[in-house]
Amino acid sequence: MFRCLMQNHQRRALVLFSGGQDSTTCLAWALERYAHVETLGFDYGQRHRVELDARQVVLRELRANFPDWAQRLGDDHLLDLGILAQVGDTAMTSDREIEMQANGLPNTFVPGRNLLFLTLAAALGYRRQLDVLVGGMCETDFSGYPDCRDDTIKSQQVTLGLGLGTRVTIETPLMWLDKAQTWELADRLGGQALVDMVIEHSHTCYLGERGQRHDWGYGCGHCPACALRKNGWERWVAGAAYAD
């Protein structure tokens, strides 16, 4: 175990960081493990563009409140992927009502989004000697997106390693956690300070709502992303109260 931790602390990571709850928790997770961590965000014409602002606030707050992590936190990168809005006409990139489609997926699914994100992250990591990619994909509390599945991520890890001719590791610390466990992980990593940061500064709501404040953070309260975050918060709080 000790040897594994030492090896991790010598590695360099790139976190896919949107500014949401999951990626904020993943960033904290990476900062606990790796010697140097950089962040990567994407502007793909998302309706909830407020998350791009949230990214900068979260990074600022992390640096201010967690000095040990601040020493390991490196450059932030933002890539323009407006083409996703052109090829994937979805409720994530256009003003449409969120609803289920005939294929069983919600129309918030942006085809190929995570596949493209990871490919570009690997290319950037190759140039900057960052051999670990960290993403917030999960198979538990999610909307059924096929590019969030564990087998998809493992397959892409192999493909990227072959295509780049080097070792590529994709870490998904939330893959088998539900939202209640994600709140618990944030608490375990950074205590109440990190939980408060997630509540106040991260952004999840698909509709970009920042005017309504709830116990679990800001959002419309009824889109799929808000529902998952809210339900996870309530289950975590109830579990913590029961444990006490």
UniProtKB/Swiss-Prot annotation:
**Which reaction does this enzyme catalyse, per its entry?**
7-carboxy-7-deazaguanine + NH4(+) + ATP = 7-cyano-7-deazaguanine + ADP + phosphate + H2O + H(+)
Cofactor(s) needed for function: Zn(2+)
Keywords of this protein's UniProt record, alphabetized?
ATP-binding, Ligase, Metal-binding, Nucleotide-binding, Queuosine biosynthesis, Zinc
Q: Where does Zn(2+) bind?
A: C205, C220, C223, C226
Any GO MF annotation of the entry: ATP binding
Task: Read off the Pfam families from this record.
Answer: QueC
InterPro entries under this entry?
QueC, Rossmann-like_a/b/a_fold
According to its UniProt record, the EC number is: 6.3.4.20
Supply the Gene3D superfamilies for this chain: HUPs (3.40.50.620)
Q: Where does ATP bind?
A: F17, S18, G19, G20, Q21, D22, S23, T24, T25, C26, L27
Q: Give me the comment on cofactor binding.
A: Binds 1 zinc ion per subunit.
Write out the pathway annotation from the protein's UniProt entry: Purine metabolism; 7-cyano-7-deazaguanine biosynthesis
Which biological process terms from the Gene Ontology are attached to this UniProt entry?
A: queuosine biosynthetic process
- UniProt keyword Repressor present: no
- Similarity comment: family membership: Belongs to the QueC family.
Q: Please give the HAMAP family that the UniProt record associates with this protein.
A: QueC
Q: What does this protein do?
A: Catalyzes the ATP-dependent conversion of 7-carboxy-7-deazaguanine (CDG) to 7-cyano-7-deazaguanine (preQ(0)).
What PANTHER family does the record tag this protein with? 7-CYANO-7-DEAZAGUANINE SYNTHASE (PTHR42914:SF1)
This one is known as 7-cyano-7-deazaguanine synthase
Q: Which organism is it from?
A: Bordetella parapertussis (strain 12822 / ATCC BAA-587 / NCTC 13253)
